[in-house]
């Protein structure tokens, strides 16, 4: 992060239990609240401090070369997967996890990315 944090103005905040690092842009949550997501702070009241400012995360995988992997948050994983397949993408795998429904896709040019639908365990967050 010594390179990217100052380059993009990110703050790197370690997550609990070795789960990686949250990348924050200070004030991003306030920007979202003022523009497209007025209820963001109320919805995330139980989240870690500054969670509304999170723009990504970083996890270092042992024995894997450094690379970027992009995850797009979507409203409906299955609809997004169906659209991607119709446009020529290949589904590499999908998983339903505690907080998300994810699918790893390969676009027609060969780039891999994930689509992720937020699904809190209690159904509302």
Please identify what each model-predicted range represents.
Residues 1-93, 104-125:
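Glyoxalase I/VOC metalloenzyme domain signal
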Residues 98-100:
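Short, small/polar residue-rich loop motifs at catalytic or cofactor-binding pockets
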């Amino acid at each position: 992060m010594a390179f990217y944090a100052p380059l993009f103005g990110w703050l790197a905040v370690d997550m609990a239990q070795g789960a990686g690092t949250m990348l924050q842009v200070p004030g991003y949550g306030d920007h979202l609240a003022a523009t497209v997501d007025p209820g963001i702070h109320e919805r995330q009241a139980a989240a870690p401090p500054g969670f509304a400012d999170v723009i990504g995360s970083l996890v270092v995988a042992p024995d894997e070369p450094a690379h970027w992997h992009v995850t797009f948050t979507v409203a409906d994983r299955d609809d997004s997967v169906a659209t991607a397949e119709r446009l020529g993408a290949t589904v590499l795998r999908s998983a339903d996890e505690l907080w998300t429904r994810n699918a790893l896709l390969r676009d027609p040019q060969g780039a891999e990315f994930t689509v992720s639908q937020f699904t809190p365990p209690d159904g509302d967050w």
